[in-house]
From Swiss-Prot:
This is Anhydro-N-acetylmuramic acid kinase. Pathway: Amino-sugar metabolism; 1,6-anhydro-N-acetylmuramate degradation; Cell wall biogenesis; peptidoglycan recycling. GO terms for molecular function: ATP binding; kinase activity; phosphotransferase activity, alcohol group as acceptor. The gene is anmK. It comes from Salmonella gallinarum (strain 287/91 / NCTC 13346). ATP binds at residues 12-19. Catalyzes the specific phosphorylation of 1,6-anhydro-N-acetylmuramic acid (anhMurNAc) with the simultaneous cleavage of the 1,6-anhydro ring, generating MurNAc-6-P. Is required for the utilization of anhMurNAc either imported from the medium or derived from its own cell wall murein, and thus plays a role in cell wall recycling.
């Protein structure tokens, strides 16, 4: 069974940077050793957002973006290697999620698309890459997401305590880790995505640091109620979603009847939407003893405070308290999934995604042995 140092690369729906994590992994442990966040240039971020919101583009433009992101991911990996004074031969493999630009797991021809050419990552790092993790699950009738609940269970499952792990990225997803039961998990709806989109359009800021802007506003209850009536929130699991659904266009449609609303009030309402939609799903599943939060949204004090208020009797804390950085959880998960793929072990959970069977995930892009010598 392949063990050693792995690197995980994650660029999520928040588009707040490329997260790169170094970890030692074997069948008994995942030990994080280092991490960094690499910036995404504005022109690449704009290109990704345009695709996700259905803007027309040529195949040439898509191909260029695929190449540019692959090179960017390689730059991020090489920066971490340089910082840690490591060589390509010191790393078993890179697990790269890629950048999701479209996710449509239902319908006549279900599909998902992550870009960031893994061939360029191999060529510019000299390290084997495992990528394209989601499409096998979709081919087996699953949602292709979320994939992190298996990792949450491996790291944070408890023999007696009823736990849930909440990842608040651009989209929020919940993992249900109940003793004696199959792991379940699904996307609850928007996490940071709508909050980030609104403050970007209004203030040209990438995110609302410390929720300072939202704290100046008041929740617009009719707007909140209107947004919560979206059918996604009432849909049964397994389910998954992304920026192709919860995007700025979605927000604009809900704001048509609130054209005179104060921008700060809209931001406060979007923070409340994230907290309420998550809390509803926690309670719908019978609650838990501990809700462990990771992802960028775990650093939003308003969302965290509202979750604690909406979930009395449940301990709401970040995964940092359990010794796992909430900022690095997803990148770490894809390093772990790369290890499982190379070990010939399944990476999906049918109880989470709805796939017909558990399967080894991803495609392997081998490094040139000469490069690694």
């Amino acid at each position: 069974m392949k063990s050693g140092r792995f690197i995980g690369v994650m660029s999520g729906t928040s588009l707040d940077g490329v997260d790169v994590v170094l970890a030692a992994i074997d069948e008994t442990m995942v030990a994080q050793q280092a991490s960094l966040t690499w910036p995404i240039p504005v022109h690449l971020k704009k290109g990704i957002l345009d695709i996700c919101q259905g803007q027309p583009l040529t195949l040439s433009q898509l191909g260029q973006l695929d190449t540019q992101l692959g090179r960017l991911f390689a730059q991020a990996v090489n920066a971490l290697l340089a910082r840690q004074r490591l060589q390509p031969r010191d790393i078993v493999a890179i697990g790269c999620h890629g950048q999701t630009v479209w996710h449509e797991p239902t319908g006549e021809a279900p599909h998902t698309l992550q870009i960031g050419d893994n061939n360029h990552i191999v060529a510019h790092t000299g390290i084997t890459v495992v990528g394209d993790f989601r499409r096998r699950d979709i081919a087996l009738g699953g949602q292709g997401a979320p994939l992190v609940p298996a990792f949450h269970h491996a790291l944070l499952g408890h023999p007696t305590e009823k736990r849930m792990v909440l990842n608040i990225g651009g989209i929020a997803n919940l993992s249900l880790l109940f003793p004696g039961q199959a792991v379940r998990g699904y996307d609850t709806g928007p996490g940071n995505m709508l909050m980030d989109a609104w403050i970007w359009r209004q203030c040209a800021q990438p995110y609302d640091k410390d929720a300072a802007w939202a704290k100046e506003g008041q929740v617009i209850l009719p707007l909140l109620q209107k947004m919560l009536r979206d059918p996604y929130f009432a849909a049964s699991a397994p389910k998954s979603t992304g920026r192709e659904y919860f995007n700025y266009g979605w927000l604009e449609r809900h704001l048509t009847a609130f054209s005179g609303a104060d921008a700060r009030d809209v931001q406060a309402t979007l923070a409340e939407l994230t907290a309420v939609s998550i809390a509803q799903q926690v309670l719908l599943n019978g609650g838990c003893e501990r809700l462990m939060v990771c992802g960028g949204g775990s650093r939003n004090p308003l969302v965290m405070a509202r979750l604690a208020a909406l979930l009395p009797g449940i301990e709401v804390s970040t995964t940092d308290k359990a010794g796992i950085s909430g900022d690095d959880m997803e990148a770490l998960a894809f390093a772990w999934l790369a290890w499982r793929t190379l070990a010939g072990l399944p990476g999906n959970l049918p109880s989470v995604t709805g796939a017909t069977e558990a399967s080894v995930l991803g495609a392997i892009y081998p490094a040139n042995p000469i490069t690694q010598s």
